[in-house]
């Protein structure tokens, strides 16, 4: 994987692109990082949408916390 410095730089660039009015579709394994910058999110399991909704709500979802956020 990328070093944490590069990951942070890439996420900063993605946020700037989005702030300029461009929609960004992000597919990312780092759920915590992705949900922290997303507006809307989908959780996929075996290729199917298992959960969807507001990213902040998903970040606080008990299923998501247990399975993807190491909480």
Identify the meaning behind each predicted range.
Residues 1-71:
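Glycine-rich phosphate-binding loops of nucleotide-dependent enzymes
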């Amino acid at each position: 994987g990328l070093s944490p410095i590069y990951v942070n730089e890439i996420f900063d660039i993605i946020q700037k692109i989005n702030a300029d009015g461009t929609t960004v579709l992000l597919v990312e394994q780092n759920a915590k990082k992705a949900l922290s910058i997303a507006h809307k999110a989908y959780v996929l399991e075996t290729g199917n949408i298992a959960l969807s909704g507001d990213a902040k709500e998903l970040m606080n979802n008990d299923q998501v916390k247990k399975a993807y956020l190491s909480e």
